[in-house]
């Protein structure tokens, strides 16, 4: 039988126990001892799940109260100076302050930058790197968890982000710093970590190096060789884990490293297996990621067993089996989904079920397969056949509409300068117009109303009335604060993707299919199982009502097609581009209906546009072609006088600014405050033709930004972008904040805009052209 293991397991708990405990701790409702107790209980439960399934190794080190990359920063003592002297040990509250800006103890400070983890919807805390930075072993947490698992009798394999990937994910904060200048100091600490793990009796350590699936410069390839030649002297065996794609140009580098085994992703890049097998050294283990760690579809175990049989014959006991990547990216347990349509449920496998798939596959490849294993494989094959034949998946009318799409459907009526003239006449906005990104706080009352509606305790009519009250409250607050372009606040929306998916055909929803996005923030991605279409308008009545309450312009709020795709579990029986075009056509109808209802501005959020970018640059053009095509297909139905906004967050834009400009949105708002407007450096060499709103405060931190801080950020922006094309706005939506935090921050933002108008030009008087309706 092949050795089975996972690269990582979801840490949040099947019922989001970790979320509830951490948020209770932040609010002072429980103490740190209670929080730690919850962590121990979850770890024990997750380790036991792996053991009960029959895995050969139990993976330890994947747990984090906030983020596993942040855990490594704490382990290395890489704490930015603004958080004070962490001393010899980085405590839990210090990591929370790094992540959130504040914690129950310690002084508040600006939170560390947060961005997407490779091409996933998981966010990590970016390590801050400084010249002459010193590293040292500064946390016992990993070793304590190993002791916990060994005390429970588990066969422990430790997982840890590798030293090169940790540096690759970091950001140089000192001018001219080459991150590789810090490698020797980092590797020194890794050597100490491996030594202590060996002393604890650990045999295998999995070092995650997904940076190896990206295009690495030659000096980084050489750095891998230098670092791992030093680490090979340790007392433990090293499994180099790569995932999220194929090794590509780094294949020789990875295979020649002095490690005891290597893991490759055979879901994202099955074609790399042949080259790896041909060059694998005879003493090395090969771990194959053959169960999809990023999607929820059941695997065809019999087909996998047939494919892998020759590999098993060739490698024998050196063949390990695993998911393609950590199971962090899928929901915990399908057994909790008692309300899913039974046919669809048979097609799925969540993290807990993927453990079973893995073990059955291992037995099928060995000499231990029993009748139950053969039955499990037969059931999986039958489920796949049922899915392929299902009449719920394909719709003739969707296919016919896709065939009718032509070039004119992707083109606005006039170029931006002419559109801008018409929009300025219609909207009559001042210099440095202010707006928000869309959502306002989802209060306990809003969430209770949604729960009551689902439970039948609140009628649809009563729920509608409650949401109208919330919209009226949000509109009134915005008018009092003095914002220029308003939003309805999205009180009725549970999630920016789920809300739309619930109203589109071809989507299904879970009750407990939660996945960690960052920290305590969890999302419940929809499952796109079939052709997508829009039976009826989704947002129009809410935006139309909000506009009736004010003479100021109201923005309609839509989630863009690429983001809906990226933040869903997507069907794997057709190209993702085809599914995205179906979503774009559905949203196009919503844009047309919003415009017909008199909404003068429509925001089509695409925060996940860059997230979908392939990790290897040679694959970028194909993706960007269809992603831009889908946005334009959604937006181009709008008339010239309707202002189209888009929003992007957590993105490095330098390498795709051409594609972003090709979207041809009239206004783009972006996340820039955590990076201190560094993202705007791209505009020194690229003249973005349309309007832009660089975020002036970090909504992920509860700290209130000062007026001077926001003025300074906008002055930096004004050095790169003409002031007549600048907007003033937060980084992102305000859903996760409280009104007590939101109002002072927005008041300061409006005050900053007024100062900027005085400095850069005479403030214009609003001419309200719409009036109350």
From Swiss-Prot:
UniProt keyword annotations, A-Z: Amino-acid biosynthesis, Metal-binding, Methionine biosynthesis, Methyltransferase, Repeat, Transferase, Zinc
* Cofactors (names): Zn(2+)
Read off the Gene3D superfamilies from this record: 3.20.20.210
Q: Where does Zn(2+) bind?
A: 647, 649, 671, 732
Q: Annotated pathway, please? A: Amino-acid biosynthesis; L-methionine biosynthesis via de novo pathway; L-methionine from L-homocysteine (MetE route): step 1/1
Give GO MF terms, alphabetically.
Answer: 5-methyltetrahydropteroyltriglutamate-homocysteine S-methyltransferase activity; zinc ion binding
Key word Zinc present: yes
What superkingdom does the record give? Bacteria
UniProt-listed Pfam families:
Meth_synt_1 (PF08267), Meth_synt_2 (PF01717)
NCBIfam families from the UniProt entry: met_syn_B12ind, PRK05222.1
Q: What is this protein called?
A: 5-methyltetrahydropteroyltriglutamate--homocysteine methyltransferase
**What is the native source organism of this protein?**
Alkalilimnicola ehrlichii (strain ATCC BAA-1101 / DSM 17681 / MLHE-1)
Q: Gene name, please?
A: metE
């Amino acid at each position: 039988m092949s050795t089975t293991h996972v690269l990582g397991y979801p840490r949040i708990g099947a019922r989001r126990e970790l979320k509830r405990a951490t948020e209770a701790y932040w609010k002072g409702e429980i103490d740190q001892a209670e929080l730690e107790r919850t962590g121990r209980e979850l770890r024990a439960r997750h380790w036991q799940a792996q053991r009960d399934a029959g895995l050969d190794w139990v993976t330890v080190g994947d747990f984090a109260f906030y983020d596993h990359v942040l855990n490594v920063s704490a382990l290395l003592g890489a704490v930015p100076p603004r958080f004070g002297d962490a001393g010899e040990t980085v405590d839990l509250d210090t990591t929370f302050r790094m992540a959130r800006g504040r914690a129950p103890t310690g002084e508040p400070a600006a939170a560390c930058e947060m961005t997407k983890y490779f091409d996933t919807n998981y966010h990590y805390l970016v390590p801050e790197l400084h010249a002459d930075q010193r590293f040292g072993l500064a946390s016992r947490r990993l070793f304590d968890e190993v002791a916990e698992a060994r005390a429970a009798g588990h066969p422990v394999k430790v997982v840890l982000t590798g030293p090169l990937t940790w540096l690759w994910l970091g950001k140089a904060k000192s001018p001219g710093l080459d991150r590789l200048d810090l490698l020797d100091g980092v590797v020194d600490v890794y050597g100490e970590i491996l030594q202590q793990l060996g002393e604890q009796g650990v045999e295998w350590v999995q070092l995650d190096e997904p940076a190896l699936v990206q295009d690495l410069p030659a000096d980084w390839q050489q750095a891998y060789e230098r670092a791992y030649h030093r680490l090979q002297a340790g007392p433990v065996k090293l499994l180099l884990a790569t995932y999220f794609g194929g090794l590509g140009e780094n294949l020789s580098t990875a295979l020649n490293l002095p490690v005891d085994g290597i893991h490759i992703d055979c879901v994202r890049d099955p074609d790399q297996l042949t080259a790896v097998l041909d060059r694998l050294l005879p003493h090395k283990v090969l771990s194959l990621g053959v169960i999809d760690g990023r999607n929820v579809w059941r695997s065809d175990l019999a087909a996998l067993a047939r494919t892998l049989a020759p590999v098993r014959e060739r490698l024998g006991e050196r063949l390990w089996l695993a998911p393609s990547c950590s199971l962090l990216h899928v929901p915990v347990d399908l057994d909790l989904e008692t309300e899913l349509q039974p046919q669809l449920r048979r097609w799925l496998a969540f993290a807990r079920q993927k453990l079973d798939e893995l073990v059955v596959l291992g037995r099928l490849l060995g000499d231990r397969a029993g009748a139950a294993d053969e039955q499990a494989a037969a059931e999986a094959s039958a489920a796949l056949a049922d899915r392929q034949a299902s009449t719920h998946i394909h719709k003739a009318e969707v296919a016919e509409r896709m065939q009718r799409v032509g070039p004119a459907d992707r083109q606005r009526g006039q170029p931006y300068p002419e559109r801008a003239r018409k929009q300025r006449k219609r909207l009559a906005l001042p210099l440095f117009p202010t707006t928000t990104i869309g959502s306002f706080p989802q209060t306990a009352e809003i969430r209770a109303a949604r729960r009551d509606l689902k439970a039948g305790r609140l009628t649809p009519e009563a729920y509608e009335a409650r949401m109208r009250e919330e919209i009226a409250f949000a509109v009134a607050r915005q008018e009092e604060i003095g914002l220029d372009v308003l939003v309805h606040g999205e009180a009725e929306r549970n999630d920016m993707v789920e809300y739309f998916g619930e109203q589109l055909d071809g989507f299904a929803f879970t009750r407990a299919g939660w996945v960690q996005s960052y920290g305590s923030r969890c999302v419940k991605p929809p499952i796109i199982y079939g052709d997508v279409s829009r039976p009826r308008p989704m947002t129009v009545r809410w935006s139309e009502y909000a506009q009736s309450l004010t003479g100021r312009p109201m923005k309609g709020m839509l989630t863009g097609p690429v983001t809906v795709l990226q933040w869903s579990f997507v069907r794997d029986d057709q190209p993702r581009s085809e599914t995205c075009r179906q979503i774009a056509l559905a949203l196009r109808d919503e844009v047309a209906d919003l415009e017909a209802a008199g909404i003068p501005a429509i925001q089509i959020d695409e925060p996940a546009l860059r997230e979908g970018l392939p990790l290897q640059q040679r694959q970028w053009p194909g993706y960007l072609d269809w992603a831009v095509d889908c946005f334009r297909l959604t937006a181009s139905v709008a008339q010239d006088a309707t202002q189209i906004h888009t929003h992007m967050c957590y993105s490095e834009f330098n390498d795709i600014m051409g594609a972003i400009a090709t979207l041809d949105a009239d206004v783009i708002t972006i996340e820039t405050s955590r990076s201190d407007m560094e993202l705007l450096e791209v505009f020194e060499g690229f003249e973005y033709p349309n309007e832009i709103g660089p975020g002036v405060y970090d909504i992920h931190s509860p700290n209130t930004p000062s007026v001077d801080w926001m003025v300074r950020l906008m002055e930096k922006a004004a050095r790169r972008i003409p002031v007549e094309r600048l907007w003033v706005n937060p980084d992102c939506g305000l859903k996760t904040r409280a009104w007590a935090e939101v109002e002072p921050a927005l008041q300061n933002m409006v005050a900053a805009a007024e100062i900027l108008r005085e400095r850069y030009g005479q403030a214009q008087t609003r001419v309200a052209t719409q009036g109350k309706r």
